[in-house]
Amino acid sequence: MTEVQDLHGQDSDEGSEEVVLTPAELIERLEQAWMNEKFAPELLESKSEIVECVMEQLEHMEENLRRAKKGDLKVSIHRMEMERIRYVLSSYLRCRLMKIEKFFPHILEKEKTRPAGEPSSLSPEEFVFAKEYMDHTETHFKNVALKHMPPNLQKVDLMRAVPKPDLDSYVFLRVKERQENILVEPEADEQRDYVIDLEEGSQHLIRYKTIAPLVASGAVQLI
């Protein structure tokens, strides 16, 4: 794995900002996105560019293996690494699809009200999937139940019928960058808010919504 991949950030005033990653750094980015997505209660920002670059990298690796000598131990090792990367990639994408199916009306509402310039939580393909899933769900409800009900009951509010992500759930995290003055909400009404510092390398169990912005920025890693 010697190729270098280019990612395009979205924080440049003059367009996309190019970030050059080695293959090892690219796979590390994928694994971080996978772990965060796996343990976060909500759908996180789409990492479609990382997914595309990893798929390109897998194609390059496959081409290199086809040219390599058969029976070489290095070929077997590289093929095992390819299978590991494919597993992480497919698990990451499956996890996102499961969240879309579980929270689709809330995800689409968040996307509709997303401020200009704010990263999307859906890739273009995921957005199409979510829209089609909602349309099919509404059609199924109408055909199976709603059409048999009185006219005043033939509507369903999916925003109320489908549960929201539980942002109050607790998550384990590892601190990658030291953070100061993190406001923590109390467990009970009689308690007061308090402030904590998160030291680099430390691990914590904390309510997700308290550190959600730090997950998005990459300052902490869910574990």
Swiss-Prot record:
N-acetylmethionine modifications at: M1
Residues modified as Phosphoserine are S12, S16
| Claim: Nucleus is one of the keywords in the record | yes
Residue positions, PTM N-acetylthreonine: T2
Keywords recorded for this protein, A-Z: Acetylation, Chromosome, DNA replication, Nucleus, Phosphoprotein
InterPro entries linked to this entry: GINS_A, GINS_bundle-like_dom_sf, GINS_Sld5, SLD5_C, Sld5_GINS_A
Region ranges (Important for GINS complex assembly) = 166-223
The UniProt record lists the keyword Nucleus: yes
Per the UniProt entry, what is one GO biological process?
A: inner cell mass cell proliferation
Name of a matching Pfam family: Sld5
Taken from the UniProt entry, a GO cellular component term is: nucleus
Name its cellular compartments: Nucleus; Chromosome
Taxonomy, superkingdom: Eukaryota
**What family does the database annotate?**
Belongs to the GINS4/SLD5 family.
How does this chain assemble? Component of the CMG helicase complex, a hexameric ring of related MCM2-7 subunits stabilized by CDC45 and the tetrameric GINS complex. Associated with ORC2. Interacts with HELB.
Q: What does this protein do?
A: Required for initiation of chromosomal DNA replication. Core component of CDC45-MCM-GINS (CMG) helicase, the molecular machine that unwinds template DNA during replication, and around which the replisome is built.
This chain belongs to the protein called DNA replication complex GINS protein SLD5
